[in-house]
Structures are given as C-alpha cells and as structure tokens.
From Swiss-Prot:
InterPro entries: Amidohydro-rel, HutI, Metal-dep_hydrolase_composite, Metal_Hydrolase. Belongs to the metallo-dependent hydrolases superfamily. HutI family. This is Imidazolonepropionase. Its EC number is 3.5.2.7. GO terms for cellular component: cytoplasm. Pathway: Amino-acid degradation; L-histidine degradation into L-glutamate; N-formimidoyl-L-glutamate from L-histidine: step 3/3. Zn(2+) binds at residues 66, 68, 236, 311. It comes from the Bacteria. GO terms for biological process: L-histidine catabolic process to glutamate and formamide; L-histidine catabolic process to glutamate and formate. It holds the Pfam family Amidohydro_1. Its cofactor is Zn(2+); Fe(3+).
Length: 402
C-alpha cells in the first residue's frame, strides 16, 4: 500500500550530512521508502492515504547503538554516596558497583527484567528511537546471560523498534572466578558463546578492554571465538586508560569501538582504515566527571565515522534520553549538531551493521522516520528536554504521536 507523506521538510542524512530537502514529499510502499524528494517533483501516482505533516521536519528514526538497558535493581544509592565523597573502591569493597547489579540481575526473574527494561525504554521510543542495541553483561554466568539475552529478544518482539542483541559476557570478572580471569575467558569462548549463539540469541559480541576488566590478549581470544561462530565484534575501549584496544578492534574489523577517551592518533588511523565506527558516550563522561576528551580532531582527520549513544546503564549513565546526548556531544566533545544527528542515525546504523536498511531517508530503506516540531535540524541538539516529536513512524506505521 502506497502512502504519501507531505507538507514537510526533510533532513535525509544521506552520506552522513543533513542533505536537506525543503518542501519535501515522501512516498512509502509497504514498510519501505519508495520515493523522496521535493514535492514539486513528485511523480503522479495513486495513494491509499495522503498524510499532511503540517510543516514538520523529517529525520530518520533515531538509533541508540549502545545500551545496557536490561538489568536488575538500580544504583541511585551509590550515586548519593559518590556525591558525598565515597570512592568507587570503597563502594565496591562493600559489595557495591557492578557486583551489586550482577547480584540483582541474577536474582531477578525473566519477567521482572522484561518489565523493568520496557519501562526504561519507553521514554527513548517516545522521543524518536526506532532501533537500538541492548547488551548483556550483568549475568556473567551461562544461565544469567541466557536470561538477559532472552529478555532482549522478547523486547524486540514487543517493542515498536528494531532491537539488536549483543553478548557482553566479557564485561567484568564474576565473583566465582576471582583471580582467574583467563579461566573465565576460556569459559566464555568454549562454553558460553557457542551455547548462546547456537540458540540464536546473539547478533554481535562485545568485551571490555581495560585495566579493571580484561587485557587485549584476553579480548582477542573472545574475538577469535566470535569470528569462528560467524559473529561480528564490538569493543569497550580506551575509556579509562590506553591499552590500544581500539587498534585491536580495527584489526578484527569490529563494527565499533566505544568510549575512546584515551585513544591515540595511531588508534584513530587504524579505525579509519578498517571502517570501524567510533561510538562516543558523553553520558558516562559527564556522570564520571571525566576530563580526558575523546580525540575528536584525530577521528575527523582519519575519516572515522562517529556515532553517539546513551550508554544507558545503572552505574555510569542512567540516561533515558538519546537527544540529551546530542547536546552533551556538542557542548562537551565539540561535535557539530550535524555530526551528532548523523551519529544517532546513519553512523549508529553502521555501528550495528544496519546501514543497508536503516539510518537515512533513501529509496529502498525502511520507512523509519520522525516528524519533529522544530524549525531547523540543529534544534535537536539545542533543546534540553521537551516533547519534540509530532509523530514517530516505524515501517511506515505511526507508533507514537506527540
């Protein structure tokens, strides 16, 4: 069924630029974009429905390409402690930090995790997100990681959004493997990944390469295991120190390397040559009061595509707004509004391997788009909060109206 969407302007994000079409029209045929361009050039046709968008601006549906949205409990108490000057080391020694989230996630039922994650994700979806990634990594044993990944799959079946599932078993060392990181990595590679991939629960594999998590050599073992299973890889890298994990990610043609505050020029060059996307996470940078900025100029010099994501998680980025991350990326990291919009559309799609079907308003791609109540695209990075979407459209069907 063909629909005509008109009386609008469009920032198509074709090629990662605004690529603006004034007085635009868009034709959908089933779930796909059939035609887009100036309304004056609209070819004649029969349409089952004509939708007047009232002068709204259209953009591709937003894509949150890095979240940890499935978890038990929350850590608001620790947030208060940190503000009172208690160090993370003291909190962790008392059983807090990621260990507390692992306990709560292991104890929660699948239904409880599903309900809490859905509640967290609703604000993102109402604000224009039509695709997202969710990572596991708070289970850290086979049964609990399976539970998390099953919840992620169920969210994909129930939410009006495309949901990609990433296995992050190599997120932290579980308490039962204390002092035996190599043994845990072996367990991931020989048992967990084959089982979870065999059940169809995994779209990609991630790891945390950092001095408080896993070494590059350990991460490489995970990458090799993922490659043998035919799964693409991603990496948390260079958030707190430089271990050149981003260069390792580039060597394995990772979809993305994420955080990157401490990456070097050589790391950026390697990522540019490999086509690995840099996923920047200003929410975690802000909450942790970091001062080491990602090397944005180096990423630009080497042609590295930059995505922006919420990093929604209970410890370092309890962020329920992807649009807020656009403003943070501009004000904290000095990206342009155009770069940030590309970062939550086309480049975010690339970071999930979805660029053929998502991320820009082009013929043949899915008709996932948002009609915004704004006067120019830069407003998406300018306003802090507010209900800006007039309509959120997924697969040519309205899923939210403001």
């Amino acid at each position: 069924m063909k629909r005509l969407w008109q009386h609008c302007h469009a920032a198509t994000l074709k090629g990662g630029k605004y690529s603006i079409v004034e007085d635009a029209a868009l034709v959908t045929d089933g779930p796909l974009i059939h035609w887009i361009g100036p309304r004056a050039e609209l070819p004649p046709g029969d349409y089952a429905e004509r939708i007047d968008l009232g002068g709204a601006w259209l953009t591709p549906g937003l894509i949150d390409c890095h979240t940890h949205a499935v978890f038990g409990g929350n850590r608001s108490g620790e947030f208060e402690q940190r503000l009172e000057g208690v160090s993370y080391a003291v909190i962790a020694a008392a059983g807090g930090g990621i260990a507390s989230t692992v306990r709560a996630t292991r104890e929660a039922s699948e239904e409880e995790l599903l309900a809490s994650a859905r509640k967290r994700l609703e604000p993102l979806l109402r604000d224009g997100v039509t695709a997202l990634e969710i990572k596991s990594g708070y289970g850290l044993d086979l049964a609990s990681e399976r539970k998390m990944l099953r919840v992620i799959r169920r969210l994909g079946e129930r939410l009006p959004a495309t949901v990609r599932s990433t296995c992050l078993a190599a997120h932290a060392l579980p308490p039962e493997y204390a002092g035996r990181a190599d043994d845990y990595i072996e367990h991931i590679c020989s048992t967990m990944l084959p089982a979870l991939a065999g059940e169809g629960l995994v779209d990609a594999v991630d790891a945390f390469c950092e001095h408080l998590a896993f070494s590059p050599a350990q991460v490489e073992r995970v990458f090799i295991a993922a490659r043998e299973l035919g799964l693409p890889v991603k990496l948390h890298a260079e958030q707190l120190s430089s271990l050149h994990g981003s260069s390792l990610a580039a060597r394995y043609r990772a979809l993305s390397a994420d955080h990157l505050e401490y990456m070097t020029e050589d790391d950026a060059r390697a990522m540019g040559e490999a086509g690995t996307v840099a996923v920047l996470l200003p929410g975690a940078f802000y909450l942790l009061r970091e001062t080491q900025l990602p090397p944005i100029d180096a990423l630009r010099r080497h042609g590295v595509a930059m995505a922006i994501a919420s990093d929604l998680n209970p410890g370092t980025s309890p962020a329920l707004s992807l649009r807020l991350m656009l403003n943070m990326a501009c004000t904290l990291f000095r990206l342009t509004p155009e770069e940030t919009l590309a970062g939550v559309t086309l480049h975010a799609a690339r970071a999930l391997g979805l660029e053929a079907s998502h991320g820009s308003l082009e013929v043949g791609k899915l008709a996932d788009f948002v009609a915004w109540d704004i006067e120019r695209p830069a407003e998406l990075a300018y306003w802090l909060g507010g209900d800006l979407p007039k309509r959120v459209i997924r697969h040519a069907e309205e899923v939210y109206r403001g």
